[in-house]
């Protein structure tokens, strides 16, 4: 809920002190009721938008992802949906911790955006489903080069998040629940692609069903 302070004190120091207290807006008396109404309305709209954005990556979340897919279907466009997620990411978190894991998530988001926009500067949508799951919606049915570029860039740079020893070995070691040491390859990225030819899908549920299948195949 946005906090708005209405005060008759016009001193600049007072206004600054108020805004330091996590207050969203300061209004000096006398107050125009119409101005106050639209201030509250606009602040509420911005807060609702921010709630739909991943605080970690700054990418739109599921609400906007679903809206984008519905729009593509309604407009009868040709498009593809790239489902991207990380392999062996849980093992990485277990060894390096969640803060380092967050760094890889942000790196993944940046890599996807850079690679997708290098091929499709406009009209490409990139979203963060949650955790290490991402989606890219692109206006083309041929995504091979985009996917290859994402994987190549990811693999070339992800090693900076590992120790030299782990990079040299090519794997990390994690104790399972029974205390047995297991080896996991360095974190990589998998991409499953759903080609949505014009009229192929009637709704986003159908896309989701095929998406689950291609994600499974990509990780196999």
Language model features with spans:
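A short glycine-enriched loop-to-beta-strand structural element that forms part of the catalytic core
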Residues: 128, 162-213
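Alpha4 helix (beta4-alpha4-beta5 surface) of REC/receiver domains from two-component response regulators
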Residues: 9-25
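Conserved long alpha-helical elements within nucleotide-processing catalytic cores of c-di-GMP signaling
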Residues: 61-80, 90-114, 127-131, 135, ...
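Conserved helix-loop-beta segment at the catalytic/binding core of cyclic-nucleotide signaling proteins
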Residues: 110-146, 152, 156-164, 169-170
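C-terminal output helix
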Residues: 13, 31-40
